[in-house]
């Protein structure tokens, strides 16, 4: 009976977590614009690097998503990277980090 019960409980997956951190369509567009314009002002409008490092999926491939999320929210002391916690929720930061690692979408 325990085996049957265990099978009936859905497994937690990365897809379920990603879906939970997906913003509403209107908010998603706001976040895309924020990253392209505000982050792009230092990291380059195409996020290929500028005053700040590149934010391409290749450049971020070895960084854990949780690290990127924390940098977005809290900044990097001693650098020009500011904290965005006052404007972004943890869910927003998780979505941005995930999308940066996938190859950030263009604004529609």
Where are these regions (language model features)?
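Short cysteine/histidine-rich zinc-coordinating motifs and their immediately flanking basic loops
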Residues: 51-56
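Sec-dependent N-terminal signal peptides
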Residues: 1-3
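Extracytoplasmic electron-transfer domains, predominantly the class I c-type cytochrome c fold
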Residues: 57-106
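Alpha-helix initiation/capping motif
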Residues: 20, 24, 28, 44, ...
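Electrostatic cytochrome c docking/interface patches
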Residues: 7-34, 104-108
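Sequence/structural segment immediately N-terminal to covalent heme-attachment motifs in c-type
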Residues: 24-48, 67-74
């Amino acid at each position: 009976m325990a085996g049957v019960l265990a099978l009936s409980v859905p497994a937690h997956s990365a897809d379920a977590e990603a879906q939970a951190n997906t913003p509403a369509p209107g908010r998603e567009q706001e976040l895309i614009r924020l990253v392209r314009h505000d982050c792009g002002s230092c990291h380059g409008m195409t996020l290929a690097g500028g005053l700040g490092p590149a934010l391409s999926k290749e450049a971020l491939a070895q960084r854990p998503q949780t690290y990127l999320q924390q940098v977005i929210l809290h900044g990097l002391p001693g650098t020009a990277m500011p904290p965005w916690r006052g404007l972004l929720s943890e869910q927003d930061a998780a979505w941005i980090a995930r999308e940066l690692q996938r190859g950030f979408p263009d604004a529609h």
